[in-house]
């Protein structure tokens, strides 16, 4: 029986380390992204995952219309928004 316990403890320890170093931070980041997408508002300055900078003109449940240079309007999925940029 001692051999089984000697094998099981390192396995559990490796799983715990894997969870706290890889899985938990990813879940936390995903929650932050979802919260940011839910809090988008008209007038927010944003950056898309493709690097396009613009201002939100309008939005609905799944899409966002972004105003870019020369008042051009582009439509993106909400999931394409990488970050909201705070104007300084």
Curated annotation (Swiss-Prot):
Membrane-spanning segments: 3-23
Any one of the GO CC terms: plasma membrane
Membrane topology type: Single-pass membrane protein
SMART domains for the chain: YajC
Main location per the UniProt record: membrane
Pfam families to which the protein is assigned, alphabetical: YajC
GO biological process: protein transport
Keywords: Cell membrane, Membrane, Protein transport, Translocation, Transmembrane, Transmembrane helix, Transport
Subcellular location: Cell membrane
Subunit structure: Part of the SecDF-YidC-YajC translocase complex. The SecDF-YidC-YajC translocase forms a supercomplex with SecYEG, called the holo-translocon (HTL).
Family: Belongs to the YajC family.
Summary of the function given for this chain in its UniProt record: The SecYEG-SecDF-YajC-YidC holo-translocon (HTL) protein secretase/insertase is a supercomplex required for protein secretion, insertion of proteins into membranes, and assembly of membrane protein complexes. While the SecYEG complex is essential for assembly of a number of proteins and complexes, the SecDF-YajC-YidC subcomplex facilitates these functions.
Record protein name field: Sec translocon accessory complex subunit YajC
